[in-house]
Amino acid sequence: MSNSTALFQRARQVIPGGVNSPVRAFKGVGGTPVFIQKAAGAYITDTDGKQYIDYVGSWGPMVLGHNHPAIIDAVLKAVPNGLSFGAPTEGEITLAELVCRLIPSIELVRMVSSGTEATMSAIRLARGYTKRDKIIKFEGCYHGHSDSLLVKAGSGALTLGQPSSPGVPEDFAKHTLTCTYNDLNSVKCAFERYPQDIACLIIEPVAGNMNCVPPKPGFLQGVRELCDQYGALLIIDEVMTGFRVALGGAQAYYGVTPDLTALGKIIGGGMPVGAFGGKREIMEYIAPTGPVYQAGTLSGNPIAMAAGLACLTELSKPGNEQQLAEKTQQLAEGLKTLAKKHGVPFIAQYVGGMFGLFFTDVPEVTNFQDVMKCDVAKFNRFFHLMLEQGVYLAPSAFEAGFMSLAHSDADIEQTLKAADNAFAVLA
């Protein structure tokens, strides 16, 4: 019995499902999850001592690679001063100043401890600011596990939301309208039906929770125009895309300006940090300057602020943004070439430092329904074939992959060699 198997059995005795976040259980791909002992650069090492090239990167934060010296040094320097104060520190100001410089649409920013807190708080703020209740989200887009966002579409854009998780009251979920990603007409119809009721529209600018689905040209701009037309706030959820698709986020890459932005993952450099920010007028509606309440015991934690500042400072260095995108392109295009070589129906979609792998014979995946038509069983086989060869991909056909600056040309070539073998088996 492997150490991972033994640990998983032990974990299930005291942790629901043996994990602290569901996707880690390998339920989507089958088998026993890999338990990690340590990580450095582009590599993770499991509890049996096997090393893997990692394309999960803690689900996005490790854009510099694991255990980056600049981040570790910043954390070690901060720790002797104390772990938490529950009071303001200079570090949170410095990180906020950097975030506002990198993302110009953010004039004021509030630190929290997770991406879920960021999106949840941004939506509460939007509702309070507009004095409206309904929100729009998109089928297949995930914005954390707050109640109003755990809703998936019924048949058609105008169907009132139904809870997609037990424990979410239908009376609460009915305020969430679900539209089709990359379909402006579905958004227009929702606004036309509830012209005075929609507080905000929240969107992943690149849908990374149905693998990796970029927006069609003009889609984000069209959403922006509809929000303006009907007086709703546009919230761009950059928890995954922020600082990864581009240094200024996907909003900079695609040229669209939101009213509010949610951040997470990279902003903490591996520590638990989220943030939401936007126009000064709107952000001043949050307590203590305004009536909308939001608080957090560990918000602005000094150790987490030090890690986040070190990460963004390093990532901001000239050439890093382009280098990250080039590495991602090298991997994705290489995979497409190998799949074609072996006659395996497959496409790879990518933007900046994130990518998605789809086993399908269509040339492009543009929404959740397209994703659901992909061959999940074939992805699962591919995942395990790669895992056996020391390549750790996201253990789900519905999750994006993440490149880091630590991945070398040799790492990518080794990954492609493993993929060549895997595609040969799948052919």
Swiss-Prot record:
Keywords: Cytoplasm, Isomerase, Porphyrin biosynthesis, Pyridoxal phosphate. HAMAP family: HemL_aminotrans_3. The modification N6-(pyridoxal phosphate)lysine is found at residue 265. GO terms for molecular function: glutamate-1-semialdehyde 2,1-aminomutase activity; pyridoxal phosphate binding; transaminase activity. Pfam families: Aminotran_3. Homodimer. This is Glutamate-1-semialdehyde 2,1-aminomutase. Pathway: Porphyrin-containing compound metabolism; protoporphyrin-IX biosynthesis; 5-aminolevulinate from L-glutamyl-tRNA(Glu): step 2/2. It comes from the Bacteria. It is found in: Cytoplasm. Its cofactor is pyridoxal 5'-phosphate. Its main location: cytoplasm. PANTHER family: GLUTAMATE-1-SEMIALDEHYDE 2,1-AMINOMUTASE, GLUTAMATE-1-SEMIALDEHYDE 2,1-AMINOMUTASE 1, CHLOROPLASTIC-RELATED. Belongs to the class-III pyridoxal-phosphate-dependent aminotransferase family. HemL subfamily. The keyword DNA-binding does not apply. The keyword Membrane does not apply. It is an enzyme of class 5 (isomerase). PROSITE patterns: AA_TRANSFER_CLASS_3 (PS00600). The gene is hemL. GO terms for biological process: protoporphyrinogen IX biosynthetic process. GO terms for cellular component: cytoplasm. It catalyses: (S)-4-amino-5-oxopentanoate = 5-aminolevulinate.
